[in-house]
Amino acid sequence: MYVCLCNGISDKKIRQAVRQFHPQSFQQLRKFIPVGNQCGKCIRAAREVMQDELTQMPEFKEIA
């Protein structure tokens, strides 16, 4: 599903970037993929996808 229509960023691309780069903030994620830098309507959904993927990662499950 497309999250950012302006830049053609899908939830899969966000999840892939989270797994590869382990960003700890949305600003860090934006260094790796161009999400939320045009109209900004996708920021909330992109953050939700990022947080969901972070909580699915094994190293974060052990901490929780």
Swiss-Prot record:
One Gene Ontology term of the molecular function aspect: 2 iron, 2 sulfur cluster binding
Cofactor binding: number and manner: Binds 1 [2Fe-2S] cluster.
Superkingdom of origin organism: Bacteria
Keywords, comma-separated and alphabetical: 2Fe-2S, Electron transport, Iron, Iron-sulfur, Metal-binding, Transport
Coiled-coil annotated residue ranges, if any: none
Chain positions recorded as [2Fe-2S] cluster binding sites: C4, C6, C39, C42
InterPro entries, alphabetized: BFD-associated_ferredoxin, BFD-like_2Fe2S-bd_dom, BFD-like_2Fe2S-bd_dom_sf
Disulfide bonds: none
Cofactor: [2Fe-2S] cluster
Described purpose of this protein according to its UniProt entry: Required for mobilization of iron from the bacterioferritin (BFR) complex.
NCBIfam families per UniProt: PRK10509.1
Subunit relationships: Monomer. Interacts with bacterioferritin (BFR); up to 12 Bfd proteins can bind to the BFR.
Family per record: Belongs to the Bfd family.
Name assigned to this protein: Bacterioferritin-associated ferredoxin
Organism: Salmonella typhimurium (strain LT2 / SGSC1412 / ATCC 700720)
